[in-house]
Amino acid sequence: MADEDINPVVLLADPKVNHRVWAACLKWTPVVKKQRVPSHHKHKSHVKPRRLTSLKVTVGSTNSRGKISLLTGTGILTRPERNHYFSLALAFCSWVRNGYGVFRYSDKELLFLASINGQPAVMADLSGNDADVAQKVSLFLAMNEEPPEKWQVVSSLEHPDNWESIITRLSSADLRRCKLTVGNRSKFTLP
């Protein structure tokens, strides 16, 4: 696995529920159907890899032609704990179909979340300082065609809301959709 695939996530503790943690900065990629590799063609490494804990979720949507598109969000936990993990990007998509928002999670750090057709945007779910996020918002707007109903701007860069405003609107069904699967990753080694 390439180094760029190792992306630690930003973890935010839910202020109202113990052991519920919201994960941001997942890497979102479209799901591509893979061909099966016969077992005698698989390469087995002789180096014992360090085990990391991964977070993963796959979501799908159907377009007007009936075609299903799937996205997978993945991230790496550097220090796993006994918590239940949920995707903040999926929570954002639960109430914003085509839009974006900038949210504050610390004194100097912001989150940029965006939704296209009710799914997380591949180039969103990112964090950084004010300048980084401004650049990411500009890139998102330049690379994505504006929908007919215009982009819904939930929280602007000039006046970012607190990230907790996202989770206050969730129903129990939305919460189930946001749940992340926790697993071990042993396919790569760390330096």
Task: Give, region by region, the residue ranges found by the protein language model.
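Cytosolic/nucleoplasmic/matrix-facing N-terminal domains/tails
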Residues: M1-C178
